[in-house]
């Protein structure tokens, strides 16, 4: 393209190019170079999804729907389940992965402290659902990108996305049975029910102190496992 005029180069960048190599397979692959114009549908959908999700966030719809739910939560398993479902709900209705994580986090953060859990437990629960399920809906930013790249709706490969489908289930079931849990003092209860000491996750100082105090109280009451020697 060294002999092309500058205007032609910008036109190719914007509208794409047509490649004719004489090889049918190569043409089918290289001929898809659609330039910036070829990505506009995806970009427009992402921008609309962000605007819509931001409006819902400012309205506080999710907080009103799920804010009262956390007062009925008294176990680690039910808290993890509520976090997972809220995160997936936000993905589906707010159309963006970041809102699927950022909106539920402040709703349940103090509940994790109340049950003596580490903030990394909250982070992992949000990732288990909010990140993995964001790509499962065609109308989210992630889903729109996948549609543009793969040329198919996420609903087509939905039944085969085993990690995305099974990870939230695994997270809830293990937590419900008191397994796979990060505690505020850095200890971790593994899949076999053994609790080992570890390094505490980062958290606001006041929240961390509250979580530690609650963890000690729950251990004294037999509601949380003690560290195995």
Language model features with spans:
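Alpha-helical transmembrane segments of multi-pass membrane proteins
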Residues: 78-91, 115-136, 160-165
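Core transmembrane alpha-helical segments of multi-pass membrane transporters/permeases
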Residues: 2-61, 80, 84, 88-89, ...
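Membrane-interfacial loop-to-helix junctions in multi-pass transporters
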Residues: 34-43, 69-84, 115-122, 154-155
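Hydrophobic alpha-helical transmembrane segments of multi-pass integral membrane proteins
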Residues: 49, 69-107
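Re-entrant/interfacial helical elements at transmembrane boundaries that shape
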Residues: 67, 97-111, 140-151
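Short amphipathic alpha-helical coupling elements at transmembrane boundaries
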Residues: 15, 64-74, 106-114, 124
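Juxtamembrane/interfacial segments flanking transmembrane helices
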Residues: 57-66, 99
